[in-house]
From Swiss-Prot:
It catalyses: (S)-4-amino-5-oxopentanoate + tRNA(Glu) + NADP(+) = L-glutamyl-tRNA(Glu) + NADPH + H(+). Pathway: Porphyrin-containing compound metabolism; protoporphyrin-IX biosynthesis; 5-aminolevulinate from L-glutamyl-tRNA(Glu): step 1/2. The gene is hemA. This is Glutamyl-tRNA reductase. It is an enzyme of class 1 (oxidoreductase). Coiled coil: none annotated. NADP(+) binds at residues 188-193. The record marks 98 as: Important for activity.
Length: 419
């Protein structure tokens, strides 16, 4: 059984390319079905898609890395050569090591972050719902969860880390002298916006508003922070009211355009605006960054901020890598053992066939009134003869080399002393 991974992340691909391969959670199931349908052997498959990475994990009799890459490139509307330049492909132990490192937060933009674990669990549930998760990938991900748990409980990998949400607050604090006088607009109502709202609310801003396509979801989040709720459609007309805008939606197209921001700046009389776009693909048109009075940051721009505390945690990283290595060895041992399962099943089936035949014969003899001891003796001899027939045949082979190999194997399997 082979395991393989194909992916792009924040270190290998720019934001706009990652945006072409971003899949919302409700898109994962149909995407997995399409992927498996495009491959010749219908492998097990799972798809992880976050703002920082898109990764496909597969397991099957033979790896189909090139076909997987070609399919993903076509899905994203780019050439295979371009995707190959910005992606990574891993097999077997390297694929397992990567999965364990990702789950443990070792491969994240924010070293040791825990959000990725929930995202992987969502991906596993989606793979199960799509009928794409088999024994091998199930083991891979369950073991990745166990490794991640041990890493977080046994090391200080997450100590002093700065989340994306905290980084956004830190940058806002550099622009505005007093966040208590700032009006903040959050666009979206997902997990990332909830985290950002929590961090900003701790600074007691002057006002908080939440714009969302679904008013119901927006109201649920707004109730936690005493925030105003507004329709997404009203955003262009009210954008000028806010000093800071943090956006993270699942939209496939930008929802805040250059024209809307220019009009907002004009109505603000050029007072600066702080904007954070945490969405992949982008929520805010990239051209907005060129405006003189706008300070726009993307997920990639926040990288230098969130990584400031990582150097002091290298000892924890080394400990975590050792835990990952142990997990990889254990998983690969399990995979190797799985290769013997068909033979074990065949051996058990053959033994059951012999047992059933001898048992049926014994029952017939007992029904005829034969002596019980004689029947049991015949039963045991019959089973013994059937089990040893193949070995005896090999020992009588005319080929000397074959006899020697058979002799060594038989001594190993049949003549071991009881311990």
């Amino acid at each position: 059984m082979a395991v393989w991974t194909l992916g792009i992340n924040h270190t290998t691909a720019p934001l706009d390319l990652r945006g072409r391969f971003a899949f919302a959670l409700d898109q994962v199931e149909p995407t997995l079905r399409a992927l498996r349908g495009s491959l010749s052997r219908q492998p097990e498959a799972a798809l992880i898609s976050t703002c920082n990475r898109t990764e496909i994990y597969c397991a099957g009799e033979k790896p189909e890395l090139e076909h997987t890459l070609d399919w993903l490139a076509q899905t994203g509307g780019v050439s295979s050569s371009l995707l190959r330049t910005h992606s990574y492909t891993l097999q077997d132990d390297l694929a397992a090591r990567h999965a364990f490192r990702v789950a443990s937060g070792l491969d994240s933009m924010v070293l040791g972050e825990t959000q990725i674990l929930g995202q992987i669990k969502n991906a596993v549930r989606a793979a199960e719902a799509a009928g794409a998760l088999g024994n091998t990938l199930s083991q891979l991900f369950q073991r990745s969860f166990a490794v991640a748990k041990e890493v977080r409980s046994s090391t200080e990998i997450g100590a002093h880390s700065i989340s994306m949400a905290a980084a956004a607050v830190r940058l806002a604090g550099q622009l505005f002298e007093d966040l208590g006088q700032v009006k903040i607009l959050f666009v979206g109502a997902g997990e990332m916006i909830e985290l950002c709202a929590t961090h900003f609310a701790a600074k007691s801003p002057k006002a908080i508003a939440i714009a969302n396509r679904s008013l119901e979801n927006g109201e649920k989040l707004a109730s936690r922070f005493g925030a105003e709720v507004m329709r997404l459609a009203d955003l262009p007309d009210r954008l000028h009211e806010f000093d800071a805008v943090v956006s993270c939606t699942a939209s496939t197209l930008p929802i805040i355009g250059l024209g809307a921001v220019e009009r907002a700046l004009k109505r603000r009389k050029r007072r600066p605006m702080f904007m954070v776009d945490l969405a992949v693909p982008r929520d805010i048109e990239i051209e907005v960054k060129a405006l003189e009075d706008v300070y726009l940051y993307t997920v990639d721009d926040l990288a230098s901020v969130v990584q400031t505390a990582q150097a002091s945690r290298q000892a924890a990283v080394a400990q975590a890598e050792a835990i990952v290595d142990a997990g990889v060895l254990s998983f690969m041992h399990w995979v190797d053992q799985r290769g013997s399962v068909p033979l074990i099943q065949q051996l058990n089936a053959q033994a059951d066939e012999w047992r059933a035949a001898e048992l049926a014969r014994a029952r017939k003899l007992l029904a005829k009134g034969e002596d019980v001891e004689a029947v049991l003796e015949a039963l045991s001899k019959g089973l013994t003869q059937k089990m040893l027939h193949g070995a005896m045949t090999e020992l009588r082979a005319s080929d000397t080399a074959a006899r020697e190999r058979a002799s060594a194997a038989i001594q190993h399997f049949f003549l071991r002393k009881e311990r």
